[in-house]
């Protein structure tokens, strides 16, 4: 028989930097999960990633106080800012453009994000990422 699920916890944690302090500790503690066990498992799973890159994670908590977790890909906005070399997006994206991205850069980001996107193919994924880039005040070359 399958374990009884008591809840899901969604967090964004920097790669390799999970520790028992907030937000991880309180979120797991109120469900009675072993905080240090999660931190060690998460840090081991993100060892090969760029340190500090925010990784969305969905933790499934079970009634017997065990858990599983699924890591998602980093947010598109973080990847776009990194590709454009920016600290933050535009405060007024319609009039104030803060950077420029090529189609090749968008394709690379789309390939990274592909497992989490619902796009049918790479071209649709590129258009989705291009829309996110435009809403951040980035000019997009080669995408209609």
Curated annotation (Swiss-Prot):
PROSITE patterns in alphabetical order: RIBOSOMAL_L11
- Record PTM: One or more lysine residues are methylated.
Presence of the UniProt keyword RNA-binding in the record:
yes
Which SMART domains does its entry note? RL11
Q: Name one Pfam family in it.
A: Ribosomal_L11
Cite the entry's keywords alphabetically.
Methylation, Ribonucleoprotein, Ribosomal protein, RNA-binding, rRNA-binding
Check the record and name the SUPFAM superfamilies matching this protein. Ribosomal L11/L12e N-terminal domain, Ribosomal protein L11, C-terminal domain
Instruction: Enumerate the GO terms in the molecular function aspect.
Output: large ribosomal subunit rRNA binding; structural constituent of ribosome
| Xref: Gene3D superfamilies | Ribosomal protein L11, C-terminal domain (1.10.10.250), Ribosomal protein L11/L12, N-terminal domain (3.30.1550.10)
A GO cellular component annotated for this chain's UniProt record is: cytosolic large ribosomal subunit
| Similarity comment | Belongs to the universal ribosomal protein uL11 family.
Q: What job does this protein perform?
A: Forms part of the ribosomal stalk which helps the ribosome interact with GTP-bound translation factors.
What is the protein's name according to its record?
Answer: Large ribosomal subunit protein uL11
Q: Which gene encodes it?
A: rplK
């Amino acid at each position: 028989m399958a374990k009884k699920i008591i809840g899901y916890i969604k967090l964004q944690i920097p790669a390799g930097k999970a520790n028992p302090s907030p937000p991880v500790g309180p979120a797991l503690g109120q469900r009675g999960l072993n905080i240090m066990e999660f931190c060690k498992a998460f840090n081991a799973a993100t060892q090969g990633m760029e340190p500090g890159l925010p990784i969305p994670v969905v933790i499934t908590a079970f009634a017997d106080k065990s858990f599983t977790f699924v890591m998602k890909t980093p947010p598109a906005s973080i990847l776009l800012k990194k590709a454009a070399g920016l600290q933050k997006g535009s405060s007024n994206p319609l009039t104030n453009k803060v950077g420029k991205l090529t189609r090749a850069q968008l394709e690379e980001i789309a390939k990274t994000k592909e497992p989490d996107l619902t796009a049918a193919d790479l071209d649709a994924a590129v258009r989705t990422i291009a829309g996110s880039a435009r809403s951040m005040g980035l000019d997009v070359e080669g995408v209609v």
